[in-house]
Amino acid sequence: NDKDELDINFLKDFIDKLELKAGGNPIQCRDYQFNAICEALVNKRNILLSPTGSGKSLIIYIIARYLLTKVKKKILIIVPTTSLVQQMYSDFEDYGLDSEKAIHRIYSGKEKSTKQPIVVSTWQSIYKLPKKWFDQFSVIFGDEVHGFKSKSLVMIMDKASEVPYRFGTTGTLDGKLVHELTLQGSFGPVYKVTTTQ
């Protein structure tokens, strides 16, 4: 579980080349977002505690795009609801990704296998799948992790124990220590994404 070396200037350059957009207009990666991205990439395991409005899906997007150039396997993004599967797909498209080509969506009844490099799924759709299914991933994001059932989350993360990059994101840790410890066991230490510099 060694930390990764990170070339900050290379990463800045990489983000510039993504030509990020929102609603068709160019946007910048803000400093606090950049800091969170660096933290996650160096640690390889983190829970990013990011308040509403801090551009959490943009942080996920940049980390995912960067790691796609570094890792040999796919990226799995797990969300609590079907509507969030759709939202993540649309957000990534909005930021400039060809989601149709790059993203496979899994929710009730959807095909579980794909050649696409990014898989977005509800946890309900995959927690009963065999360990072998999780072996195709190098990176796992749990988005809105406070909304996962602890038991199902542990089942997923146990099966994904070989996956080197593991990130959880949430706007809130509900103060239940047990759940928080479960999350940290699955994803690593909490990093507070502060929007005030």
Model-identified regions with their sequence ranges:
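Charged, low-complexity intrinsically disordered regions
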Residues: 1-3
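Conserved helix/coil segment N-terminal to the catalytic DExD/H
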Residues: 108-139, 150-155
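Post-DEXD/H (motif II) to motif III coupling segment of the RecA-like Helicase ATP-binding lobe
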Residues: 138-139, 146-197
